[in-house]
């Protein structure tokens, strides 16, 4: 992935911004056994973690801890991490993006959510117990950890990998069973990993032109200062400092920052924080009674460097809130890049069907993902994938965050469902689209399940709700049709999306977890709309568009509140072979036909000299 992402960590007196290294890629030669497994379409055996666990337990003894926690996240709480930060995957063998590993002197457990139950069951070896998060009767990872820490046992964790809030919560849970939590600055997994641990990737930091960003960074900093002035904490922002490996700065980036911010080495942040805490402690004026304002996503180690809870107020980052409300230039960029990205996906699906059906080609899931990348590269302003493409055939489609690997992936079966979840990073926006296709003859149940998911998708797209409504409140709009049939899906319905930034962005979203009830949806948010259905061991269905939240006109305005709705921006047709018009209402059929007419209008000009793709698009956008 060539995407550059920066996570903004902040505290005040002064403000600090942290630039996180982007995710890198690594490759290694395939063994004979891997080639044989590919040929036979067999899943790989789990990684044998016996020796790794033995080495870790020896280090635990040396550091006087009885239980050790291995989070998924890096020191910036990133969802997508560099290979060198994949500590949980290394120690457990489970490669999904979410989960937590806990190792005691005699047991090991891996907790993950419903997206990864199937994947984890296949990847964990006999040393591990799978804790299925959210399943009745299954303890949370915190509860399981507390059970292992009974009677005065000590639990250790790298304090840079969990937030201060999570550390406090865990500490309270442990106290109930007589355990305690300590931070161990030297990461024990890194020691076990040794020289085999991948190097941290280094990419160039570049400038996003104001023509695409919509607002110069000086205005954003000034808006942040005004926001902070209302917080009345220990000091105002008087300068901006960036802690970064400055060798990564392009000449343009260095020039833009010159005279406006102070550049300091990345690792200097902790010493600088300690100095701030000491200066506050020795202050004789009123500043000593104030607190530092710190992101609630900042690490426990940073909070400790500032003097801990008594010196720090943890809040949701105002930078996170500001990023979630796109400006008009960013919104127009989203619309434009989704037309180009839609054209790329249309070209890919037409190529794939022709290759499988007309040419009889044998293509595996990685071949498909690679071809899609090659097609996207042709389109203007493309920089790279926004995440690893989920190219999944048949049963693999039921693995919600499946990642095909060349050594183990399946050959695409033209007689099975094919789910493709992919996205691009364009200089004018970020895309994330999922379509489920069938190149043969789907079963009646597959068509019914597809219709139920599509109905939920349309229900979200058509939703109108008063300002102040959360994504939690509208999540059931997407699930209601599945619920009537006794079906459901184990993931959120929608997430925020960054503008040439993270494809998953907060603070708002649409889902059934309590977190989605915290922040209301707002005009100029960009979110995904992606209900699904998954039959383990058989197939998966997910239909995802990105939408812009916007104010809508209503006949009345109860309580003088504005009402909000959505504008779809993804331009990719739904699968005609899976569309059964008899399962849709007249209004739903009209929505599909109107959507397909717009897809044709926006994308067909790209294929005036591409008869294959144009014919495919014409067929897939015909009225139902």
From Swiss-Prot:
Enzyme Commission no: 3.4.11.9
Identification of the protein by name: Probable Xaa-Pro aminopeptidase P
Gene: AMPP
Record-linked InterPro entries: Creatin/AminoP/Spt16_N (IPR029149), Creatinase/aminopeptidase-like (IPR036005), Creatinase_N (IPR000587), Pept_M24 (IPR000994), Pept_M24B (IPR033740), Peptidase_M24_C (IPR032416), Peptidase_M24B_aminopep-P_CS (IPR001131), X-Pro_aminopeptidase_P (IPR050422)
Needed cofactors: Mn(2+)
Binding site for Mn(2+) 1: 432, 530, 544
Similarity remark: Belongs to the peptidase M24B family.
Keyword DNA repair: no
Cofactor stoichiometry and binding remark: Binds 2 manganese ions per subunit.
Molecular function GO labels: metal ion binding; metalloaminopeptidase activity
Catalytic class of the enzyme: hydrolase
Keywords: Aminopeptidase, Hydrolase, Manganese, Metal-binding, Metalloprotease, Protease
Record keyword Manganese present: yes
GO cellular component terms, A-Z: cytoplasm
A single GO BP: proteolysis
Described function: Catalyzes the removal of a penultimate prolyl residue from the N-termini of peptides.
Catalysis: reaction(s): Release of any N-terminal amino acid, including proline, that is linked to proline, even from a dipeptide or tripeptide
Domain of life of the native organism: Eukaryota
Native organism taxonomy: Eukaryota, Fungi, Dikarya, Ascomycota, Pezizomycotina
Residues reported in the UniProt entry to bind Mn(2+) 2: 421, 432, 544
